[in-house]
């Protein structure tokens, strides 16, 4: 059994940021459970591009709003608290963050 809090992660090597986003990586590959789990916060007013080549990513937006764009098809999806998206095809995508977003993924 693994039990952690975000306070346990804060300020460690599992607390990663890149200017406009911050990811608290609660479960990682070295935990040997076959998946990862993160709490990610993205700053309002930012635009970020992401691409996960080696894993499927499920994202549940618990706070905030913005726009998700599939960069391969141009398809756009409005996001708000309660939205979920699944990147099961390793899609390159962009997140435009209108209100600060907090995601569990």
Predicted regions and their residues:
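Short, acidic/polar N-cap/turn motifs at the starts of alpha helices
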Residues: 11-13, 23, 37, 65, ...
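Residue-level detector of conserved, well-ordered beta-strand and adjacent loop positions
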Residues: 27, 43, 62, 80, ...
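Conserved short histidine dyad/triad with adjacent acidic residue
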Residues: 21-23, 36-53, 89
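Ligand-binding loop in jelly-roll beta-barrel domains
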Residues: 80-83, 89-105
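A short, N-terminal "cap"/entry segment at the start of jelly-roll beta-barrel domains
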Residues: 1-35
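Conserved hydrophobic/aromatic beta-strand scaffold that supports enzyme active sites
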Residues: 37-41, 58, 76-78, 84-86, ...
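A short beta-strand-loop-beta hairpin characteristic of the jelly-roll/cupin
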Residues: 47, 52-53, 58-81, 91
